[in-house]
Amino acid sequence: MAQQAPDREKALELALAQIDKNFGKGSVMRLGEEVRQPIAVIPTGSIALDVALGIGGLPRGRVVEIYGPESSGKTTVALHAVANAQAAGGIAAFIDAEHALDPDYAQKLGVDTDALLVSQPDTGEQALEIADMLIRSGALDILVIDSVAALVPRAEIEGEMGDSHVGLQARLMSQALRKMTGALNNSGTTAIFINQLREKIGVMFGSPETTTGGKALKFYASVRMDVRRIETLKDGTDAVGNRTRVKVVKNKVSPPFKQAEFDILYGKGISREGSLIDMGVEHGFIRKSGSWFTYDGEQLGQGKENARNFLLQNVDVANEIEKKIKEKLGIGAQLTDDANDDALPAPVDF
């Protein structure tokens, strides 16, 4: 027969007291005991993408996966997040499994390359062990692993070229993510995994595209972003950049399936000013008449390129537009020391 309500409450309190004694205070708590704090974020560098993510950037203490075709802008998005974390006084690490990080390009995007922790590991096990140790130090704000496809298991490197190693990488990723997820939440570190696309053979219906490294990352990631290049930007006949579309295909901290479009300029990265113009026009802060762009009665320029240059030279105007857009849409403040004190890492859920 079921226990009476007072007896059940007493039994629960005794169990909770024993758990606190064995595992430390706060091991189990009621969700309503404390006021839920806003989720701390790291801005992406594109206000359009921050809006699509729903909380103003990438959530701290979570796993984020960025995937897409080659040269679509995956590493650029990750490096902008690194630059924004560093600008707020954070510490960043980059696990360069592809051995392809360009320090000069990273510097142009605003990354403090002198302070950036970089590792170019020999094997997938070494890469993930280094990542785990850095996360568990509790000192890291953001960690980028570029890329999952390049995390080659030690057995594959030491074996012959034609040897079969079925499922080795998937098992490696599954084990690593099991270890990392709790540590990420405790330390408030954002882990960005950059991934490549492959095609499944014999798929008749639906998309044949899939990501490398098995299914574990799909489950553990709180945010998954599909990055695609949709258009080449030209200045006359010269290609100067790409128009990029990002679809948030999974989001545990906000409604998913939102899209963002922004410009990535060659050698400069994400055009913050271009995103502000797009979002400003969309939400009525910037008026577009023909090819002219006007803000608050002041002409920004004829054509998007001239308007972009105006905002580049007039930072106060750009900041004012950004503030108005964020206030209207109610998206979070940037990762500052003050915001860090008030905001907590997003709680882990599966």
Swiss-Prot record:
- Tell me the leader sequence span: none
Q: Which Pfam families match?
A: RecA, RecA_C
Q: What is its subcellular localisation? A: Cytoplasm
Q: Does the keyword Metal-binding apply?
A: no
Q: Name the GO cellular-component terms.
A: cytosol
Gene Ontology terms, MF aspect: ATP binding; ATP hydrolysis activity; ATP-dependent DNA damage sensor activity; damaged DNA binding; single-stranded DNA binding
Q: Which residues bind ATP?
A: 68-75
UniProt keywords (A-Z) are: ATP-binding, Cytoplasm, DNA damage, DNA recombination, DNA repair, DNA-binding, Nucleotide-binding, SOS response
Any one GO BP annotation for this protein? DNA recombination
Q: Specify the superkingdom.
A: Bacteria
Primary location recorded for the protein, binned into one broad class: cytoplasm
Q: Which family does it belong to?
A: Belongs to the RecA family.
Its function?
Answer: Can catalyze the hydrolysis of ATP in the presence of single-stranded DNA, the ATP-dependent uptake of single-stranded DNA by duplex DNA, and the ATP-dependent hybridization of homologous single-stranded DNAs. It interacts with LexA causing its activation and leading to its autocatalytic cleavage.
Q: What is this protein called?
A: Protein RecA
Q: What is the lineage of its organism?
A: Bacteria, Bacillati, Actinomycetota, Actinomycetes, Mycobacteriales
Gene name?
A: recA
